[in-house]
């Protein structure tokens, strides 16, 4: 959605993937590390970043900085789930995110679970279709999160009142 200023103290960091890469040169092999990190404040802000370096800790630090630069705000319904179902794509990876009733929990696989934990979502159902590559999955999940909109923002875009959009939107406005 929109870029957000970041505050280090409140951010949680999750290391999603570390990969050792090898470059074959004339003198032998050169090793390096690649890291993917998700950061979030557990209150609707989340970001993901990728870092590469000769040491794991350096790669993790670079990834964290990149994730903080790419943080975005996501509208949440009652600070526990998303407002509506949404589909995100990235290459061959496709992700379906569905809102869930209170008490459902996070039903999602690996890298998606890390994003939802960092985001502060408590109830969601997520299904991945196609590629299960970590980078593609995270990218597809962020694509889906970018498509989310609150009923209030949809009403403003259409120059209408929230209760004119749909019956469910009227219920949401009353509950907020």
From Swiss-Prot:
GO CC entries: small ribosomal subunit
Keyword 4Fe-4S: no
Disulfide bond positions: none
Any GO molecular function: structural constituent of ribosome
GO term, biological process aspect, one: translation
SUPFAM superfamilies given in the database record: dsRNA-binding domain-like, Ribosomal protein S5 domain 2-like
Sequence ranges assigned to domain S5 DRBM in this UniProt record: 11-74
Pfam short name (any one): Ribosomal_S5
Keywords recorded for this protein, A-Z: Ribonucleoprotein, Ribosomal protein, RNA-binding, rRNA-binding
Keyword rRNA-binding: yes
Cross-referenced Gene3D superfamilies: 3.30.160.20, 3.30.230.10
Family indicated by similarity: Belongs to the universal ribosomal protein uS5 family.
PANTHER family xref list: MITOCHONDRIAL RIBOSOMAL PROTEIN S5
Record's comment describing the protein's domains: The N-terminal domain interacts with the head of the 30S subunit; the C-terminal domain interacts with the body and contacts protein S4. The interaction surface between S4 and S5 is involved in control of translational fidelity.
Subunit structure: Part of the 30S ribosomal subunit. Contacts proteins S4 and S8.
Job description of the protein: With S4 and S12 plays an important role in translational accuracy.
The protein's name: Small ribosomal subunit protein uS5
Organism: Rickettsia conorii (strain ATCC VR-613 / Malish 7)
